[in-house]
């Protein structure tokens, strides 16, 4: 081999070896998938606002994370613990007037109502259950099992 060809070959090998770690490192970079964790948007109804959801793990995580930001959270499940949707909900104020009426499209409802005492009635499969909640500082959770 001619000396100039050997020099060229050696330069190419040394250059490739110098760049190889960068190439391997660039190929092994893992970019995590971005999963949206946004709860559905609020709806108006009666004297308050609400949002129901929690179907699917991403939405459930987002809804549970948002519970602390709302005066009232409603959870619906079967006695076995399986999540439940299509629950008819009526919230009445201390005077017995309907403050909010909705049908949940998921096992979690986040409710924004003014401070006060409310009776929450939830109905599923012909069974109606009720709980009294007092809203003020902090957030409250009413858990309904059917």
Regions found by a protein language model. Give the residues of each.
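Bacterial N-terminal signal peptides that target proteins for export
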Residues: 2-12
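Primarily secretory-pathway and cell-envelope proteins
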Residues: 25-87, 124-146
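Hydrophobic loop/turn residues within beta-sheet-rich immunoglobulin-like superfamily modules
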Residues: 113-116, 136
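Short, surface-exposed beta-strand/beta-hairpin micro-motifs centered on an aromatic residue
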Residues: 106-112
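Bacterial N-terminal signal peptides
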Residues: 11-20
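Short beta-strand segments within Ig-like beta-sandwich modules, predominantly Fibronectin type-III
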Residues: 99-104, 133-134
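Short amphipathic beta-strand segments in non-cytosolic proteins
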Residues: 88-99
């Amino acid at each position: 081999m001619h000396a100039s060809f050997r020099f060229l070959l050696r330069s190419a090998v040394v250059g490739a070896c110098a760049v190889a770690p960068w190439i391997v490192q660039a190929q092994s970079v893992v970019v995590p998938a971005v999963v949206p964790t946004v709860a559905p948007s609020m709806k108006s109804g009666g004297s308050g606002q609400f949002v129901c959801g929690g179907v699917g793990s991403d939405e459930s995580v987002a809804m549970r994370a948002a519970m602390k930001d709302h005066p009232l959270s409603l959870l619906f499940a079967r006695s076995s613990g399986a999540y439940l949707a299509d629950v008819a909900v009526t919230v009445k104020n201390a005077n017995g007037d309907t403050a909010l009426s909705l049908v949940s499209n998921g096992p979690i409802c986040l409710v924004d109502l003014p401070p006060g005492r409310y009776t929450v009635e939830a109905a599923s499969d012909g069974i109606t259950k009720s709980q009294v909640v007092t809203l003020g500082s902090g957030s409250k959770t009413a858990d309904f099992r059917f």
